């Protein structure tokens, strides 16, 4: 059975790149009837925060990416927080030391930095060897560390050989001999380095596939070497293309919103965000663009993951969100819009006038790209606009007749509203375009908006007459 994981660090909000990684792992796990695991990589003690972990979990749940095992749901391979697995890492680090594949380094950070600068000054890559690093391991230094209560770092001795990766996305990748030197696996504070911890965890959690961004490709040679050192089977790796901004540069804050939480708060639907992210580096075999999560699972395959960078197009996301909003059932449309309507009315009012609010939303749904636009689009239905429209005497006369016609209407429906329009304009020289355009501005304070018949029907007889009378003095 396939087992895939998403392993974020709780050092910030869920970036769209991380969300896409989670999505691809989720889709393949579900497609193959396997397991999707959430693991929290919180070994960066200074930057990891509980609130970020909660934010990551909430953002993933909002997207609909439910996991089978994780810190909140448990499982057979826990704990699922790296900070709760430190003894496990130490056990395997000691094993490498015993086998002569790793060694202790009693060097201070500034000494490592000086060594790095020296190598660079000599025109060499900053690749360390056991000989270089163990020059600091003297009896005096060991005593000094013990006296200060310090612990040595542990370095893995990188075999000087060529490594070959058959990547799911990139194909055959060759890491030439000497690509990397010896590297730390345990810091002097006892906390494991990323490359070491994730290898131990992926092996012990029986992870079969690792799908991640290609910014991790350089880490892979270190991880393959560790798998070989332990004589463990290596999972299948797939490195998906980077996400770039519209200017073809790495996606960052300067391009606008980049976290899932930002898009959620701006009124994007989770199914739209998921749909959009899926198409950043993957394509449907028939070129289909609008899909829900189940359709994505059915269509997903690893062979359609692209090698080229994906462009994050905010306009495409807005269009996709609009499409998903229009495809919602009436009840669901009201449900997702509710929090934006509460700016003007109470929950009870929405529930008691459900049909009215559904018609209101249907009247504006073709204008909505972000749900956060709803308050501005519906404001005039609840708050009378402060507007002055220059009306000719002829138009005023027609509007006075319109008031009289409306006052006679007993059943407020589209047919009677349209008949009132016709009756008011009968015999007048006022053109229909002027009549309707200025009526819209008088009633809404705007030149554009929902169909005028919807505006008049939804505002209701009393409001329409009140606004017309106020404007006509």
Curated annotation (Swiss-Prot):
Spell out the Gene3D superfamilies in the cross-references: 1.10.10.350, HUPs
* EC number(s) reported in the record: 6.1.1.17
Q: Name one Pfam family in it.
A: Anticodon_2
Motif 'KMSKS' region at which residues? 250-254
Q: Name one GO biological process term.
A: glutamyl-tRNA aminoacylation
Localization annotation: Cytoplasm
What would be an example GO MF term here? Answer: zinc ion binding
Its recorded reaction(s) are: tRNA(Glu) + L-glutamate + ATP = L-glutamyl-tRNA(Glu) + AMP + diphosphate
Q: Which residues are involved in binding ATP?
A: 253
Disulphides: none
Keyword Protein biosynthesis annotated: yes
Q: Which UniProt keywords apply?
A: Aminoacyl-tRNA synthetase, ATP-binding, Cytoplasm, Ligase, Nucleotide-binding, Protein biosynthesis
Q: Which residues form a coiled coil?
A: none
InterPro entries (UniProt xref):
aa-tRNA-synth_I_cd-bd (IPR045462), aa-tRNA-synth_I_codon-bd_sub2 (IPR020751), aa-tRNA-synth_I_CS (IPR001412), aa_tRNA-synth_I_cd-bd_sf (IPR008925), Glu-tRNA-ligase_bac/mito (IPR004527), Glu/Gln-tRNA-synth (IPR000924), Glu/Gln-tRNA-synth_Ib_cat-dom (IPR020058), GluQ/Sye (IPR049940)
Q: Which CDD domains match?
A: GluRS_core
Q: Where is this motif: 'HIGH' region?
A: 8-18
Q: Which GO terms describe its cellular component?
A: cytosol
**What is the annotated quaternary arrangement, including any partners?**
Monomer.
Please give the function described in this protein's UniProt entry.
Catalyzes the attachment of glutamate to tRNA(Glu) in a two-step reaction: glutamate is first activated by ATP to form Glu-AMP and then transferred to the acceptor end of tRNA(Glu).
Task: Supply the HAMAP family for this chain.
Answer: Glu_tRNA_synth_type1
* NCBIfam families named in the record: gltX_bact
Name the protein family.
Belongs to the class-I aminoacyl-tRNA synthetase family. Glutamate--tRNA ligase type 1 subfamily.
Q: What's the protein name?
A: Glutamate--tRNA ligase 1
Name the source organism.
Thermosipho melanesiensis (strain DSM 12029 / CIP 104789 / BI429)
Gene name linked to the record: gltX1
